[in-house]
Swiss-Prot record:
Top-level taxonomy: Bacteria, Pseudomonadati, Pseudomonadota, Gammaproteobacteria, Lysobacterales
Family statement: Belongs to the CarA family.
Recorded superkingdom: Bacteria
Cross-referenced HAMAP family: CPSase_S_chain
CPSase, as annotated region: 1-186
Pathway note: Amino-acid biosynthesis; L-arginine biosynthesis; carbamoyl phosphate from bicarbonate: step 1/1; Pyrimidine metabolism; UMP biosynthesis via de novo pathway; (S)-dihydroorotate from bicarbonate: step 1/3
Catalysed transformations (reactions): hydrogencarbonate + L-glutamine + 2 ATP + H2O = carbamoyl phosphate + L-glutamate + 2 ADP + phosphate + 2 H(+)
PANTHER family named in the record: CARBAMOYL-PHOSPHATE SYNTHASE SMALL CHAIN, MULTIFUNCTIONAL TRYPTOPHAN BIOSYNTHESIS PROTEIN-RELATED
Coiled coil: none
Role according to the record: Small subunit of the glutamine-dependent carbamoyl phosphate synthetase (CPSase). CPSase catalyzes the formation of carbamoyl phosphate from the ammonia moiety of glutamine, carbonate, and phosphate donated by ATP, constituting the first step of 2 biosynthetic pathways, one leading to arginine and/or urea and the other to pyrimidine nucleotides. The small subunit (glutamine amidotransferase) binds and cleaves glutamine to supply the large subunit with the substrate ammonia.
GO BP, one annotated term: 'de novo' pyrimidine nucleobase biosynthetic process
PROSITE patterns reported in the protein's UniProt record: GATASE_TYPE_1 (PS51273)
Name of the featured protein: Carbamoyl phosphate synthase small chain
Length: 374
C-alpha cells in the first residue's frame, strides 16, 4: 500500500500526496526547476544542498536511474517534489527505478500534488521554507519544522559539501558506445576548488588536457601556489557566498599573482566578491536547463543550465571588470571578466548535466587563457 506524504510551506499551504521515496521528515528551501530531464543529476548536484526540488515537468522517472549519471557520491538535495512517477522506467541504461533509488538513498519525496499550483506560489511569493514528511504524518510537526528552518542565506554550505581531502582527477566524459571514459594527454596543471563541484565539470576539464588536482574549499592560496598551477578553477556550489571569506581571500591572492582563473556558479559570485562587488539574494532564483543568456560581446543568445539563488549586483562592480553575459529572463548578471588580469566567470553551468552545451566553449576559453600565460 502506498504511504502518504505531505509538503508544508512556511506560508501555511499544505499539499497532500503519495510517498515515492524514503519515509521521514526533511526540511529546506523549496525551489522549482524547469528541466525536462536529468533528475538524477539534479538530485546529486551539491549545489542543491538544503533545497527541496520541485520539478515542473509532470512525468519524472521515465528513464530510471544508473550509477553513471551521479554528479557526486551522494544525494545532496533535501527532497524531491513531482507530479507523477511512472511505474515502469524504460531505458537501456536503467539499473533501478527512481522510486527505489530514492528509497535506497534515504531521500524523502512526494508525488501526486499539483506542481503547477506550487510553482505559481514560488514564482509569486519567492522561494519558501518547507518541510516534506512521508510515512507517519503529523501536520503540526511539519509546520513547526518549516518555520524553524533558518534558511540558506548566511549559511556557509561550501565547506559542508566540499571534499575533506585533495585528490587527482584524470577521467574525461563517458563514451557510451565504448562504455569507457575519454582521456586526453595532460597539458595544463589546474587546481580546482571544490565548493560543491559536479563530476561532469571535472570530466570536461580533463578531456581538454587539464591535469586536475581537486582541493577542499578552505585550502589557503599558498598551498595552491606551491603546486605551481597553470590555472585555478572555482567550482559551483550551494548557498550564500557571503560567509565564504576564506575563498575570497584566496582568490584575491590569485588575482594579485595573475594566475588564470575560471569560475562558475558559486565560483562566479566569489570572484565578483573578490574584486569588491556585492551578491544579493534572488526572489526565486534560476533553476532549470532552458534559460536564455546573451553574450554581450557577440550578441549571441545561448540556452543554458542554471541553478542559483543569489546574483551579482552589477552596480557594485569596479571599473576594471566588464560584464560579459546577462540573463534574458530578468536581466541579472551572468558573467564577468577582469580587464587587467586573466580571470573570468559565468553564473550558469557550462557543463550542463543536465542541459544544453551552448556555453561549453567557456572551458576552451580557459585553456586558451592558460596557453597564453604559459
Amino acid at each position: 500500500m502506498t504511504e502518504h506524504a505531505i509538503l508544508v510551506l512556511e506560508d501555511g499551504t499544505v499539499f497532500e500526496g503519495d510517498a515515492v521515496g524514503a519515509n521521514g521528515l526533511s526540511v529546506g528551501e523549496v525551489v522549482f526547476n524547469t528541466a525536462l530531464t536529468g533528475y538524477q543529476e539534479i538530485l546529486t548536484d551539491p549545489s542543491y544542498a538544503y533545497q527541496l526540488v520541485t520539478l515542473t515537468y509532470p512525468h519524472i522517472g521515465n528513464t530510471g536511474c544508473t550509477d553513471q549519471d551521479d554528479e557526486a557520491n551522494k544525494v545532496w538535495a533535501a527532497g524531491l517534489i513531482v507530479r507523477d512517477v511512472p511505474r515502469r522506467p524504460s531505458n537501456w541504461r536503467s539499473q533501478i527505478s527512481l522510486s527505489d533509488w530514492l528509497a535506497a538513498r534515504g531521500v524523502v519525496a512526494i508525488a501526486g500534488i499539483d506542481t503547477r499550483k506550487l510553482t505559481r506560489i514560488l514564482r509569486e511569493k519567492g522561494a519558501q521554507h518547507g518541510a516534506l514528511m512521508a510515512g507517519e504524518i503529523d501536520v503540526g510537526k511539519a509546520q513547526d519544522a518549516a518555520h524553524q528552518f533558518a534558511g540558506i542565506k548566511g549559511m556557509d554550505l561550501a565547506k559542508v559539501v566540499s571534499t575533506k581531502q585533495g585528490y587527482s582527477w584524470y577521467e574525461g566524459q563517458l563514451d557510451l558506445d565504448r562504455n569507457e571514459c575519454k582521456r586526453a594527454a595532460p597539458q595544463y596543471k589546474v587546481v580546482a576548488y571544490d565548493y560543491g563541484v559536479k563530476l561532469n565539470i571535472l570530466r570536461m576539464l580533463a578531456e581538454r588536457g587539464c591535469d586536475l588536482t581537486v582541493v577542499p574549499a578552505q585550502t589557503p592560496a599558498d598551498e595552491v601556489l606551491a603546486l605551481c598551477p597553470d590555472g585555478v578553477f572555482l567550482s559551483n556550489g550551494p548557498g550564500d557566498p557571503e560567509p565564504c571569506d576564506y575563498a575570497v581571500a584566496a582568490i584575491k591572492t590569485f588575482i594579485m599573482r595573475r594566475v588564470p582563473i575560471f569560475g562558475i556558479c558559486l565560483g562566479h559570485q566569489l570572484l565578483a566578491q573578490a574584486v569588491g562587488a556585492r551578491v544579493v539574494k534572488m526572489s526565486h532564483g534560476h533553476h532549470g536547463a532552458n534559460h536564455p543568456v546573451q553574450d554581450l560581446r557577440s550578441g549571441r543568445v545561448m540556452i543554458t543550465s542554471q541553478n542559483h539563488g543569489f546574483a551579482v549586483d552589477e552596480a557594485t562592480l569596479p571599473n576594471n571588470v566588464r560584464v560579459t553575459h546577462r540573463s534574458l529572463f530578468d536581466g541579472t548578471n551572468q558573467g564577468i571578466e577582469l580587464l587587467d588580469v586573466p580571470a573570468f566567470s559565468f553564473q550558469g553551468h557550462p557543463e550542463a548535466s543536465p542541459g544544453p552545451h551552448d556555453v561549453d566553449v567557456l572551458f576552451d576559453r580557459f585553456i586558451t587563457m592558460m596557453a597564453a600565460q604559459s
